[in-house]
Design a protein with these regions (language model features):
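Secretory pathway targeting signatures of secreted, lumenal, and periplasmic proteins
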Residues: 35-86
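Hydrophobic residues embedded in beta-strands of well-ordered beta-sheets
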Residues: 51-53, 93-95, 147
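Short aromatic-glycine motifs in intrinsically disordered, low-complexity regions
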Residues: 21-36
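Surface-exposed amphipathic alpha-helical segments
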Residues: 99-177
Length: 177
């Protein structure tokens, strides 16, 4: 009987933990709601200002991974960041996800190809940010050696980050009721 009770308690605790994680991953503005990717759970935090939401690393860098903006029908994104994805909310509005292409930017910074003062990362931060931006699908060394290349173009790294977000974050974005 004690084994059965222990198993029942363990199952109940696991269900509670899963529900807590799901609740903590769920975020919402007045215009949309989303779920933070499971691979980011406990590693990122969010900030919100109206219908703009930023997702940033909890590491010492506090580097923003991406930002989401709700746009009304006919509006277009006017920022300097790379558009990483767009989701129609079905009500005439959409959410644009944008940000720096972190795998590319970090590899360029570490290899000395950029001199922007705000683009400095410790190796630990570089590794963590690449893992967050790619969902642990690529390691920092792979990005540095395989994807950035000598031509200085970010196309492959951009595709990698867009593909990851398209599979994880974008499908969770829905209109807020």
């Amino acid at each position: 009987t004690s084994r059965m009770e222990a198993a029942t308690r363990a199952t109940a605790q696991r269900k509670t933990q899963v529900a807590t994680e799901a609740n903590e991953r769920h975020k919402a503005t007045n215009a949309y709601q989303l779920d933070i990717p499971l691979a980011w759970y406990g590693k990122v935090a969010t900030w919100q200002n109206g219908n703009t939401m930023g997702i940033y690393a909890l590491s010492g860098s506090n580097q923003e991974i991406c930002r989401l903006d709700a746009l009304r029908n006919g509006e277009t994104y006017q920022g300097d960041d790379t558009v990483l994805g767009t989701v129609s909310l079905g009500n005439g509005a959409s959410v644009v996800v944008h940000g720096k292409v972190l795998p590319y930017q970090i590899a360029q910074t570490i290899s000395g190809r950029t001199e922007k003062a705000d683009d400095t990362y410790s190796m630990d931060e570089a590794v963590e940010l690449v893992e967050l931006a790619t969902g642990n699908r690529y390691a920092y060394d792979q990005i540095k050696h395989d994807l950035v290349g000598k031509d200085g173009k970010s196309d492959k790294a951009t595709k990698l980050e867009k593909d990851y977000l398209a599979q994880t974050l974008l499908p969770s974005i829905k209109a807020e009721n």
